[in-house]
Amino acid sequence: MGMDQTVKSRITRIQLALENNEWLKAFHLAESGISDEPAILPFRYLMIDALIQGGRFDEAAKKITLWRKDWPKDRKLGIYALHLHVYFKKFDEAERLGETLLEGAQNIVEKRDITLHLAFAAHGKGNPRGAILLLNDLLSEDPLNTDAYETIGKIYFENARFEEAERYLLALTDIDPLHPRVHQLLGLLYSEQGKWDEAIMELEEAVEIEPSDETMRELGWTLNMVGDKDGAISVLEEALDMNPLNLQARIDLGTIFMDQENYERALAEWKIAQTQDPGNTAIKSNMEKAREKVEKDRTISRH
């Protein structure tokens, strides 16, 4: 039996709220829909979507667990559960559920989604070969699946198989040149191999597509590695403007100031870093070295 026009209208309002990233509004609209029409499952799906968009993953998982008791055969709730098992690194549970869901996959889109998350679970369990087999099976059916290319590239990178990683990541750039993560991954891959110019080019591309403090940090440190200290400082300061709590960016900036013999600036950065991570012995050691240099410079200047 189809939904009446009022229900469809309410669902559309929730979907629009989600499209506008108004997750709390979407949540309350879905909550109202569930209260008025408890048998209409799309209201529950949209509530889960709202909770996930708002980063309330624990609450989403609780709702899914509760509702699957009432609708144990509902495949969409099962797929939500699979996604969250992977998110929470419950890889054994994800594999069991995923294999069950895969047996009854009702369409190609559903099959691809389940296969992808089974691959994530295999990777999480330390079975890279199994993950790659699943992902290559997925690519044989869906040769434009960007998630599969990205994940295979990451797995090969993690296992120091750089040529294979590069091949899959470059294939991903052919499919989607504006993919938000592929240029960052290529930048890290080239950095790991000491190919600094290539790394800088890819990281600059990543920053242009989707700026983030972590990508800026990676670019800043790579600029430092080719001797562009001023460029590195500028980029790292920009990363810290975006996120003052990026601890590694703060440490990197202090290190570069130390290399430049700008000991007071180095000490200032590491003091801030220590407030973020008081037990970090490396930061403490760096602070002591910088403080000694500052005191030495002051002693010399007094004489």
Map each language-model feature to its residues.
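Canonical tetratricopeptide repeat
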Residues: 46, 80, 114-117, 151, ...
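Short coil turns that delineate tetratricopeptide repeat
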Residues: 38, 72, 106-109, 143, ...
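Register position in tetratricopeptide repeats
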Residues: 19, 53, 87, 124, ...
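Helix-start (N-cap) detector for alpha-helical repeat units in TPR-like alpha-solenoids
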Residues: 7, 41-42, 75-76, 108-112, ...
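Conserved structural position within tetratricopeptide repeats
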Residues: 32-35, 65-69, 103-106, 136-140, ...
